[in-house]
C-alpha cells in the first residue's frame, strides 16, 4: 500500500489558500477540467456550486437545478457528451436523485462523472442523518471519503481518474464538519481536458431490459476491479504503530483517532466502498485487536465481519450523531485499550439557550399566525417555515420531506380528517417537488387548500436563486415562473394572491380558501427580509404607558420583541429592539391596545 494520500501536482504551479471544505471541493472540480456542473442547494452542500459559479463561464457551465434528480440528469447528459461533469447535493437529495443513479450505475459514463454528497451527522439542518455509503453499495459505485479540506480537493480530482478508468460514477462523501471547516489547501491550475464527443452507443446508453441484463454482470466485475485497484491506491493508507490494537477508519473519524491515539496502528480507507480485502486482512493480522471507527452506520464494520474477520465497532462507538475525539476516546477506553479521559467539572454557568426562530419581519410569521387561528390541520414542508412547528406559532402538524405537504394533505382529507386541511410549501420547494402532488390533488378531486409561501428566494440555504426569481446562478436575467399561471394550468380554479403583511386580508383569504370545495391555492407573496438585501424600514416602538401586557404580540415569536422589566397586573410588558426591528408592522396589527407605533424619523 502506498504511504501517501495526496494527488501529485506540479510544484511550480502550486499555491496555498485557506479554503472551507466546500470551497476545496469546488476548486478540485474546477482544476479537474469540469465542463458541466449542476446542483440543488441544501445544507451542508450549498457552497460547492456557489463557488463553482465564481469561475469563468468560459470554463464551465453551472446551474441551480429545480431538484437533485434534475441536477444529476444534467450532469449525466454532460458525461454522455464526453465532458467531465459534476453534481452536488445534500444527503437527502440523493433520495430524489437515486432513480437516475441506480440506472446510471449500470450504464456507466463516457466523460468523467463525480457526484458529491454531503451527509449531516448530528442532524444540524436536515430531516435525518442517513449514510450515503449505503447508497453507494446499493448502486454499486465507489464512494470516496476525504478527512480534511486538502483531501476534499485532491479526492475530487482523483475521482475523475477513477470514473474514466473504470467507466463509473464516483461518489465523494463529505460531512457537515468537513464541508464547513476551513484549513490550508494546496491548489493547482485548471487541467485542460478535451471532450470525447457524444457516445453513440445505444446498447450502452439506453436503459432497456435487454441492455441492462448485459450490463449488470459488467457492474459486478467493475466493483471487483475497483476493489483490486484500491489495494495499491493512495486512497488506502497504512500507518504502522503499536500492534496491541489497530483502527480501520476514514473521513473525519480518522482525525479523531489520530488525536486521541496517535501511537495506534491505523488503516485509513479513503474509499469506503468497495473495500480492499487483501489490505484489510493483512492489517487485521498485524494487530492483537481490531476496531472500526466510523460515523453513523456500521458500513465498513459489517463488510469486514462478512469477511470472517473479528472486529469491534458499534458496540463501543455510537451509531447515532456525530463522533468526536471525546466519544472515540470513551469507546477505546471502554474496550480497555487506553485510559479514560480525566473528568472535567462542567462550567458553573450554563450557556443561554437561543432556539431558532423566524427572522424579524419574516413574511411567513403572519401566515402561520393566521393558520393557527383557523384551527386547521396543517401539513408542512421543508424550509425556514418549518420553524412554525414550535411555539409560539406552533401551527404545523406534519413535516416529512421536500414536497410531501400537498400529498400528505390529500391523504389526511381522504382519511376523513374533520378539520380544514391546509398544505404549506415554499416557492423553491414547490418547484422542487410540489407540482406532481398538486396535479394529483386536482386530478383526484381532493378537498384541500395549498398555501405557497413565495418569498422569491431559496431562503433556508442562504438565498439562492431558482426559476421563480428570474435570475440564474450567475445572476443573469431569465424567465420567471408565475405560480398563479402554473396552478391554473393544472386545473386549480380558485387561486388568490395576498400580501402576508396585510394580516386582516390574509386571514379572510384563508377562510374563503378553506370554505371552497376542491383544491384552492393561496399565494402568500412577499420577498424574504434578508435576500437579496436586508429590508429595513422605520422601526416601531411600544408606548409603555398604553401597554396592558396582553402579550398578544409575543405570539408572533419575533426576535425584535423582548420582555420589559415593567409589569402590568403582574404580567411583563413588551419592548421592541429597534436595532432588530425592520418595521413590518405585524406586531402593531395584532396589538389589542393600539400602543405600537412607528418611531418618528
What positions do the PLM features span?
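Thiamine diphosphate
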Residues: 1-149, 240-241, 263-266, 306-523, 533-535
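Short acidic, glycine/serine/threonine-rich loops at helix termini
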Residues: 48-51, 74-76, 97-101, 123-130, ...
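Short beta-alpha connecting loops at secondary-structure transitions
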Residues: 59-60, 118-122, 139-144, 312-316, ...
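Conserved thiamine diphosphate
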Residues: 120-169, 175, 206, 210-213, ...
